[in-house]
Amino acid sequence: MRLPWERQPLFYRHDPSSSPSSIGYDGPRISPQFPVGPLREAVVGLAETPRRWFWQVWGCSNSRENLNRIGGEPCWVQDAEYPRCPTCDSVMAFLLELDSNLPTTDGGEWLWGSGGIAYGFWCDLCGVSGFLWQCT
């Protein structure tokens, strides 16, 4: 059986208070085979990215570049993959991406697959978020 997060993309509808509810998955709650602790709390800041980093190539970063971002253009591990909103069928806007190797509370690191990137998207018309990840 495939885990819910292996079915891509995952979609969530957000109510007026921003609380999410899953769209398209009503199966049982499943635990991962290799569980990992929650992400470690961190203080983050936003900074305008210099034009030089507008486009980044995942294959050239070698874990030396910050591939976590809000807005801008995604840094695709594979081919570009913009999901369509399951409610209105519009192409969803890119919202954010999170790179692998994020520290967890149990001393480990969070990996998207074998060390890829997770991408978040948003449909403002429907209040729907979409998430997918890519790895090699």
Predicted features by range, described:
Residues 1-136:
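Preference for intrinsically disordered or flexible, low-complexity segments
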